[in-house]
Amino acid sequence: MFRSLSAIAVALAAAAIAPGASAQTQSQTPAPLSPDKAAFRALYKELVETNTTLSSGSCTLAVERMAERLKAAGLPAADMQILAPADRPKDGNLIAVLRGTDRKAKPIMLLAHVDVVEAKRADWERDPFTLVEENGYFYARGASDDKAMAAAFTDAMVRYASEGFKPRRDIKLALTCGEETPDTFNGVGWLIANHRDLMDAEFALNEGAGGRLDATGKPVFVGVQAGEK
């Protein structure tokens, strides 16, 4: 028996949150969160509860809120850019850079999208834009795809900045819009076409690949994504 998972998201989120974004041991009175896990929980909640649907939401607002958290952690404003087409001001994308020590080494990119599929209230048992935890599971539009990964990546950058961590390579965080509606707008494609220098990296960690664990939790393989729609 095998269990599938998004290997990168799980690896990052596991260190950041106590009651995981999937299952946990059920308890009526969960243990209090440590300060770092509480900080992640607050970031995750803010991101999930920011409506980023195409019809009525704003990716720009979502990435502005994440940028404010990065700025508060000490990441220089000069190392963050929010970019959107002039005719699509709500489809903003955030590029944030944690500077490394080796200027010759190509960057690593942490890539996640913050837009979500439409959510009609009538179709949901709960408000789709209110993060709810029940029996060890989180419920809301985007709680998994892809705001869990976006929150994990942003939280990692917040921690790195606040702790003064200096990686060898630059680490780029790209929070993008339009993954769910590429026929209307594709943030990654637009960034590559218009801001290629900001998107250049040795490789990117993205949601598109994945991996498997066996029944005991031992890693079996990690898939590699070779392209992005």
Locate each region found by the language model.
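Acidic/histidine-rich catalytic neighborhood of metal-dependent amide-processing enzymes
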Residues: 137-138, 144-226
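Active-site-proximal flexible loops/turns
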Residues: 9, 58, 119-122, 152, ...
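Short Gly/Pro-enriched turn/cap motifs at secondary-structure boundaries
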Residues: 84-87, 224-229
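Positively charged n-region of N-terminal signal peptides that target proteins for export
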Residues: 1-4, 77
